[in-house]
């Protein structure tokens, strides 16, 4: 599986249009430990990987069985030779037109002190969150509150995307809930449970 992930990332970077900057989720082995990561790709290169910090270990989620927390990578940049890139938890990236963004993953937003808090203090204008948050009664509304409150607290844009219907199983249902918020206001949100590909902009 890990070899297939590496091959897929290398293929994606080669086939992706140069003008697109993409962030995708991937499990990565780093120095003998497995991390749940967001991988940044642009112009035929894998720019970096950001590991998830807060791992849920309750209810239906038991991530600590498989993954290590990225907290140990707070200030360290560690090379991933196969991908010719590195991993660093507190990385801030900058687009060609000067927009600075940071990344956190799913449960990081639910934490008492999300990584996005310090990322915004250090200059991130937009936070991207790659998530796999399942559907339960009223959970959509709870996510809306978390996202709007964090974007208000950090005075930044917040882009949240979750796993879609095709990633559901007999145990968990995912709706593909996606939200774009700015400084406390939700400015775009999808309906969820969409079966076709779509593009959401704001």
Located regions from the model:
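Enzyme catalytic cores with a strong preference for nitrogen-chemistry domains
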Residues: 1-202
């Amino acid at each position: 599986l890990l070899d297939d992930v590496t091959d897929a990332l290398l293929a994606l970077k080669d086939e992706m249009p140069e003008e697109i900057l993409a962030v995708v989720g991937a499990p990565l082995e780093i120095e003998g430990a497995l991390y749940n990561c967001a991988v940044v790709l642009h112009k035929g290169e894998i720019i970096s990987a950001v590991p998830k910090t807060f791992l849920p270990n309750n209810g239906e989620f038991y991530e600590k069985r498989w993954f290590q927390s990225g907290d140990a990578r707070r200030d360290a940049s560690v090379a991933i030779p196969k991908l010719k890139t590195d991993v660093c938890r507190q990385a801030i990236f900058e687009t060609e037109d000067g927009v600075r963004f940071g990344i956190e993953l799913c449960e990081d937003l639910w934490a008492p002190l999300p990584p996005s808090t310090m990322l915004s203090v250090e200059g991130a204008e937009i936070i991207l969150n790659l998530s796999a948050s399942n559907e339960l009664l009223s959970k959509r509304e709870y996510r809306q509150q978390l996202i709007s409150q964090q974007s208000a607290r950090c005075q930044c844009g917040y882009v949240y995307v979750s796993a879609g219907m095709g990633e559901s199983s007999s145990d968990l249902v995912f709706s593909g809930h996606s939200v774009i918020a700015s400084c406390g206001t939700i400015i775009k949100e999808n309906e969820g449970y969409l079966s076709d590909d779509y593009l959401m902009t704001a």
